[in-house]
Amino acid sequence: MLQITIRSGVAMHRFLPALLLGAALLFPPAALAADKVLIVLSGEGRDAGKTRPGYEFDELSQAWLVFKANGLAVEVASPQGGPVEPDKYNPDEPFNAQLLADGAAMAQLAATRPIAGLRASDYRAVYVVGGKGAMFDLPRSQPLQQLIGAAWANGAVIAAVCHGPAALAEVRLADGSPLVAGRQLTGFTNEEEALFGKKWAKEFPWLLEDALRQRGGEWSEAPLMMPHVVIDGRLVTGQNPYSTVGVAEAIVRGLGRTPVARTPGRDERSMALVERLRGGDAAGAARTLKQDPASYHVELIGMLGFYQAKAADVDLAALRPALQTMELAMPYMAEPQLKLGIAEAHLRLGDRSRARTLVLEVLDASPGMQQAGDLLKRIDS
């Protein structure tokens, strides 16, 4: 399940979502009818992220739907205002399709409010959406820094997901200290950046994890691309896109509300299944997936395990759950790269026989596949 870390004083406790009903006690109550959330988007994007990176539409749509379902008013802003462009995304994902069908929401996205024209006192919460564009225009926007600082001083919940915490890096409190100093938080990790941020990372002003650590933030992270939300008082941060719903519901709780019941999406169910596997119940996770594979995003599970195995390198303790995750997806995926990834993991763990069997299966289906042939040579060397 989604991992959520709540900080209260100096003690740290980990809770499952079902135990978070008391989290609202960490925040000041607000008048329900007046609760308004400001969503901040990067305006950097061009050409669906091809020539300049933008924001992540998935991180916008999933949070927006949570906010609206819980009766919160929503406004959207960007550093310069006007239309903003997301990176490439799947419009057929149910949460994206639902937002795209909302005419009022799309009108806001076509004419986002410029940050400089906003009053912090109008908002009970600020939510910063990620995407690699957030690493460029958000941390250099002084009006945004001032708005977040003033909103924090007014008692607002400040939240960000994935690369969104870049907007927090340069925020200063009234005494000149960084907002993040001494506070538990998370965001897109250096490990995740090394695998998924290569195109733009060389242009970043800094790596997000490094910047927040250097400014005194107490960094927290889960394994690669696993959902992870950190709550420290009124500061709520999420590690990656799969933390979006957890962040949004933490904001709802922070405003004194109990999130309405909802059916988890396919990606959420898939991540929860992987968490179950990583918690020691690989057999139970496999049985659950076998009962209804269509309710899960099997390709996501396979890809997650593949990249976790790649990131594990020589860390065999990290490699084993990555291998189990790939094997969870393998019966439902015909992708030869996944089977080769599993073979590679077995080889690294010392099981040459199993690795060889898997590679031969790939070569039987694709006799000329050079990558499989090269791996077989390594196994037999």
Across the structure, where does each feature detected by a protein language model lie?
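N-terminal signal peptide c-region/cleavage motif recognized by signal peptidases
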Residues: 28-29
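Short, thiol/selenol-centered motifs that function as redox-active sites or metal-ligating centers
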Residues: 158-165, 248
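Hydrophobic helical h-region of N-terminal Sec-dependent signal peptides
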Residues: 17-21, 25
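Extended, subdomain-level signal for the structured scaffold at the beginning of enzyme domains
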Residues: 34-153, 167-186, 191-203, 207-209, ...
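Detector for intrinsically disordered, low-structure N-terminal pre-sequences
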Residues: 9-10, 23, 361
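N-terminal secretory signal peptides that target proteins for export/translocation
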Residues: 1-13
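Alpha-helical and His/Cys-centered functional microenvironments
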Residues: 6-7, 17, 350
